[in-house]
């Protein structure tokens, strides 16, 4: 470890809703906090899979859009300005002889006094478009994630996919894009009936059953070639952007190699949210214990327990029971 590599009090693996609230609460306990997230954006599955869906079982909200909840959590944690590392997947996690945890990602090495794993169902990556030469368009105008809808304003967009995410993104783009087309390989969409009805009544163009067979363009995609699944008829669409929503593949991945007790693809914790390795905690859907319920609301309750016990771990003089937030600001 070099002198300029800061040792954080708490490093959080996973930037979904539980991870974001964990970061806020870590700030409440005056801890230095870092979040490491494998995706290009915070919010986990809420942002990546169903940003426009309503959530009804979060305390205090009769209903709240998934992305709105994420935005509120991000705004909440900004009060303490945690360090955020995006597009980083943790490969190895080990406890050194001095008690400091060393986390090696695909980009760099991090050091921390404690670790809280809030990785949901594990690291997940998008199912990519399996066409020759697609890689050169990524991070240009071939998108697997959408972090800013406004960049599609006035542009011609094609969405590939037939599930909730594909239909949601199409409906979000419909009022701001110049033209939006959704192409699905089946006649019927797998999305919620109400969403499909809204899609059919919108100005979005629907191409079914079609599959993409070619992307045309030198530096960026300029045209998409779609082929009818049954007749093999081909059509060419002029585009400015392509969004692929073929779903995601998730797995615990390297987490299984960190020496943690794993039960049915979840990390076993005790009532302190502590794993079998002192100093490593877990919260949210990634963890399990007797009576565990996998809900966002439960993750929000587990986060303070993990943080307070982590604080007591790396600072034995700290009180486990914190002050009430109403008396702190």
Curated annotation (Swiss-Prot):
It catalyses: 2 reduced [2Fe-2S]-[ferredoxin] + NADP(+) + H(+) = 2 oxidized [2Fe-2S]-[ferredoxin] + NADPH. Pfam families: Pyr_redox_2. GO terms for molecular function: ferredoxin-NADP+ reductase activity; flavin adenine dinucleotide binding; NADP binding. Its cofactor is FAD. Binds 1 FAD per subunit. It comes from the Bacteria. InterPro entries: FAD/NAD-bd_sf, FAD/NAD-binding_dom, Fd--NADP_Rdtase_type_2, Ferredoxin-NADP_redctase_2. Keywords: FAD, Flavoprotein, NADP, Oxidoreductase. Its EC number is 1.18.1.2. FAD binds at residues 18, 37, 45, 50, 90, 124, 285, 326. SUPFAM superfamilies: FAD/NAD(P)-binding domain. Homodimer. Belongs to the ferredoxin--NADP reductase type 2 family. This is Ferredoxin--NADP reductase 2. It comes from Bacillus mycoides (strain KBAB4).
């Amino acid at each position: 470890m070099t002198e300029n590599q800061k040792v954080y009090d708490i490093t959080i693996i996973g930037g979904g809703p539980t991870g974001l609230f964990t970061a806020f609460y870590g700030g409440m306990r005056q801890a230095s906090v870092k979040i490491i997230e494998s995706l290009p954006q915070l919010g986990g599955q809420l942002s990546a899979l169903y940003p426009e869906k309503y959530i009804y079982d979060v305390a205090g909200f009769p209903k709240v859009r998934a992305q709105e909840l994420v935005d509120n959590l991000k705004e909440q944690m900004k009060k303490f300005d945690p360090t955020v590392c995006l597009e980083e997947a943790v490969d190895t996690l080990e406890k050194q002889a001095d008690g400091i945890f060393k986390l090696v990602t695909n980009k760099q090495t991090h050091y921390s006094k404690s670790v809280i794993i809030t990785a949901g169902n594990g690291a997940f990556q998008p199912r990519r478009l399996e066409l020759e030469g697609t890689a050169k368009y990524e991070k240009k105008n071939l998108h697997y994630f959408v972090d800013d809808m406004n960049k599609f304003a006035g542009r011609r967009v094609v969405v590939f996919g037939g599930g909730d995410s594909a239909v949601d993104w199409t409906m979000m783009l419909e009022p701001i894009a110049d033209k939006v087309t959704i192409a699905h390989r089946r006649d019927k969409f797998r999305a919620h009936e109400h969403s499909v009805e809204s899609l059919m009544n919108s100005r979005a163009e629907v191409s079914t059953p079609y599959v993409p067979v070619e992307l045309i363009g030198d530096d960026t995609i300029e045209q998409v070639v779609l082929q009818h699944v049954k007749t093999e008829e081909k059509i060419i669409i002029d585009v400015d952007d392509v969004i692929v929503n073929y779903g995601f593949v998730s797995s615990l991945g390297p987490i299984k190699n960190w020496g943690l007790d794993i039960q049915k693809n979840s990390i076993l914790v005790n009532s302190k949210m502590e794993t079998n390795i002192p100093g490593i905690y877990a919260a949210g859907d990634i963890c399990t214990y007797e009576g565990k319920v996998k809900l966002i609301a439960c993750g929000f309750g587990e986060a303070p327990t993990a943080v307070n016990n982590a604080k007591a771990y790396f600072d034995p003089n700290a009180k486990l029971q914190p002050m009430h937030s109403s008396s702190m600001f």
